[in-house]
Structure formats: C-alpha cells, structure tokens
A protein has these predicted regions:
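Extracellular attachment/recognition segments
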Residues: 1-84, 92-277
C-alpha cells in the first residue's frame, strides 16, 4: 500500500487519464495552478469558474476533465488554447487503509472521518464558480482557504468567496468544490504542511519532520485584486503554487487587462499545502 501522486497540465475542455501502478483504493483531485484567459483581448466579466470532472474507468485509472468559464454577456468567451489547470491526483493504492480518507466534495458534503481523533486533517481547493447578474468590471476575485468544520468523526467544508468591481456590484453566484485529506495513523507514510498567504514576489519555508523525497503542492485558496482599489476589464487570471528542492514555497496570483493594469502584488496571494511522501 502506498500514496501515489500524479500531476498533469490539462487545457480547459480537455481530458486526461492518470494511470497508477496499483489498484486505487481512494483518491482526491485538486490543482496547483489554473489560468483562465480571453486570449489576446480583454472584456467585461460576468462569469469566472473552474471545475474538474472525474471518472474512474478502471481500477488503476482516474480520468479528469477540466472545465472553465470566463465570459461576459456579449458573447465573449474563454480561449481554451490559453486556459488550463495543473491537476493533481492523490491516490492511495494497493491494500486499503481504513485510517485514511481521500475524497472530494462541496458545501453539502458530509465527510466521514477515519476517527474522531486525526493526525492529518487538511482541505484542498478543486474548483469555484463566481458570477455576476450581468457584466461588470473586476476589481477582486477571492476564494478564501477552505475551512474544515469538524463534528466528532464527521466534517464539512466551507469558504468565503467574493467577486466585486468595487462599485457596489458583487457576485450573485458563489460556489466551490474541494477535497479532504484525513488520517488517524501516527505513521501514515506522508506529511501535509500548510502555507499562509504566499504573496506575489515572496516565498515561505516549509519544514518536514521526515526526509521525504517527493513533494507536491496543492492550492487551498487565493486572492487577486487590481492595484489602487480599482475595477477594470479582464484579459486573464493566473494563480499557482510551486515548491522547490530547498523546502521553499512560491506563489503567484495575477490578473491583467490590455491597458497596463495589473494585480496589486501587496494584496494578491495564494494559499495551499505541500504533501511530502
């Protein structure tokens, strides 16, 4: 039995298969990066969304389709050739481990934990849907770190989501998809370390208790906003979390239009976890 993790970059509206060495007992899917773009043009915004559709065609394979939406009310839509997600599939393979939970869900999902006492309890972001009633500028897009709300041996997930033009208009639709990693084992065979607000052009050190050889970052939330507290058209939004060989986490949360307006690096950040195994 072992933890296996695979990552792939998948364009919006495309699918890819993740084939593992052994039989998959349980799994979850998340992201370490996403980019949503109109292409060469900038436009108003009505909807910004990302979702991951998953299927398991056989005992060793997970198929993931990336769906994304960046659109206004005038027919301008996402450029799928310039829009993608880096998808992370975390799977426990081989013999089942009843001290472990890997699962995806949303605000309505009640997760059954392996125990009322856990050594690992971490959430990840797997998608979001933000929409105005009609076209507006974008000033800020925010999906706060997914919260784990625990009640004995069950848990639910929640977050706060915002999309605003800073002129009194806010998203009328705000939903999310997420995942949960939970273990009650004192030696699960991996560690999970969380980051806290990795701002643009900064980094954070992550220290593990064991000398793991593999490390994979996953996003748990983000905030991106234009400078000067202003709203503008949008050309693209690009958010990612990365991890290097010297225990350092880097994050970028960016957006821009075609008039030279960019995100505020002082106020834009990404949150996540790093799995060492």
């Amino acid at each position: 039995m072992a933890l296996e993790i695979q990552t792939k970059q998948i364009n919006v509206n495309a699918s890819s298969e993740f084939t593992f060495t052994n039989t998959i007992q349980e799994f979850l899917i998340g992201i370490s990066r996403f980019r949503l773009s109109y292409g060469d043009s900038d436009h108003w915004v009505k909807t910004v969304s990302l979702s991951l559709n998953q299927q398991q065609p056989d005992s060793n394979t997970i198929s993931v389709q990336v769906l994304g939406n960046l659109s206004d009310g005038s027919g301008n839509t996402i450029d799928t050739s310039d829009s993608f997600a880096i998808v992370v599939v975390v799977a426990w393979t081989g013999t089942a481990d009843h001290t472990l939970l890997l699962a995806n869900g949303d605000a309505n999902t009640v997760f059954t934990l392996p125990s009322s006492s856990t050594t690992i309890l971490s959430s990840i972001l797997a998608g979001f849907d933000l929409a105005y009633d009609t076209d507006h500028y974008i000033a800020q897009i925010n999906v706060s770190t997914i919260n784990v709300n625990r009640n004995g041996n069950t848990a639910t997930l929640s977050t706060t989501e915002n999309m605003t033009d800073r002129d009194g208009n806010w998203a009328s639709t705000a939903t999310f998809n997420a995942g949960l990693i939970a273990s009650s084992s004192s030696s699960p065979g991996f560690e999970v370390k969380a980051t806290s607000n990795v701002y643009n052009n900064t980094n954070q050190s992550v220290t593990f208790n064991s000398a793991w050889t593999n490390f994979v970052p996953m996003m748990t939330g983000f905030n991106v906003e234009y400078s000067n507290n202003e709203g503008h058209w949008l050309k693209s939004i690009d958010v990612y979390l990365s991890y290097d060989a010297v225990n350092t986490v880097y994050g970028v949360s960016s957006m821009c239009d075609n008039d030279g307006n960019w995100q505020s690096n002082e106020n834009s950040f990404v949150n996540g976890i790093v799995i060492g195994y």
